[in-house]
Curated annotation (Swiss-Prot):
Low complexity bias spans: 18-57
Key words, A-Z: Kinase, Serine/threonine-protein kinase, Transferase
Enzyme class: transferase
InterPro entries per UniProt: Actin-fragmin_kin_cat_dom (IPR015275), Kinase-like_dom_sf (IPR011009), PI3/4_kinase_cat_sf (IPR036940), Put_AFK (IPR037469)
Region: Disordered, residue numbers: 14-58
The name this protein goes by in its record: Putative actin-fragmin kinase DDB_G0268748
Amino acid sequence: MKTLRELRNKISFDKNIDSGSSSSNIGGSSSNSSGTTNKRSSGNFNGSSASSSPSSSTNIDYNIPTFSNIQNIDWKSISSVEKIDFGNSNIFLLITFNNNNNINNINNLNCNCVNNNNNNICNNNCINNNNNTNDENPSIINNYNESQILLKSSSTIAHDVYAYVLEGILKYPIPEMRLLDFSNLEYTEMSYNLLIHSKDDQSLNDFIKSELEKSFFLILEYRNNGKRFNELNHKEYFSGSKGGKKFKQLGKIIAFDIFCNNFCKLPSPPLNWNSSTFFSNILCYDSPDKNGWYFSLINSNISFLNTSPFTIGYRDHLNRLKLLLFSIFQNPSTESVQIKLMRDHLLKCQGIKLSGSSVSYLQKGIAKGIKSIVNCINFTVLENTKEKVKNIVKLDNNNIWKKSIDSIYCPFLLDVLNEIVIEFANYREKTYFIKA
């Protein structure tokens, strides 16, 4: 059996395959403070390109930022608070602000990042996200409606931050974001105003109180006019000349789900699937962003398997993974068992009918996403990212953050990655179909 590195170095791609697999800094991921309120420093990487070769990625430092452009928020200017349930326990608060107050506070920063070439980090630690920023003025988020943001908290929010960093490396369409922790004065200001503006809705007020018992919130960009997957007119949305491209992008999203233990879930699907199992973590748009994405990943939907490699469940999971990858790479135009299960589930539980023609595009997208994972991710990246994400929080009440990070089982992710690399190497002669 060849080693993982040998298999990586062995892979040679068809000349027709898109060459754009370079790594990217995650845009505006996590932060411990807002604006000038509390500039506590925390660990970060100096991002650099990973477009040379898969094996060279061990020398790459990926940026885990501590600030983002979503800062200096005037929480007193909240006009409404709404709870949005995306399914799979992904509940967000949609915060709407009075435009005149909050836009000025967000955009009128004394920011030098327009003239700064230091790999996406300006002197104020603003993050110039390659995926989301405006080319002419990188300090202002492209397509960002500054009058609204999303808030999310969970007991495993560190998993989300970890996944967002990996998604940023893979150049997925992640929103601008930052982390706000309980030790920050802004956390108190946010809490007070959220409770004030929800006092007339007892259910919402109770929910906010329960969320505020948690120590960390993610503040995320909200690009308006997006629809949830189950709200689409799917026949209309995926028709026309761009329908195939949209399905391929969904396939790339599935590829990351495969890597992070979502698509091949335990117990065997569809026993643990529900009405929001697939694509509950995305917003869909009629028009693409500047990088051509029609989707935005508002939640990682990640669920790491933390168990022994000697258990039956562990091996069953990897066997299902191998079967899926074998099917996709061996017969790219023939529907794999798990893609068929997904389509059947969407039709039965949500009344969503994805056409038979979608199969080829979805599986091409999965293969393209797998190519990117093989190129950009390795065990060093997984471990270094885990360590750096662990260290971005300086005050960790009851070790909540540390425990969440420690539950990320990198050996399992490496085993999954190993299977992906092996299957990709075995059937790379068929990778002509990955062309975007």
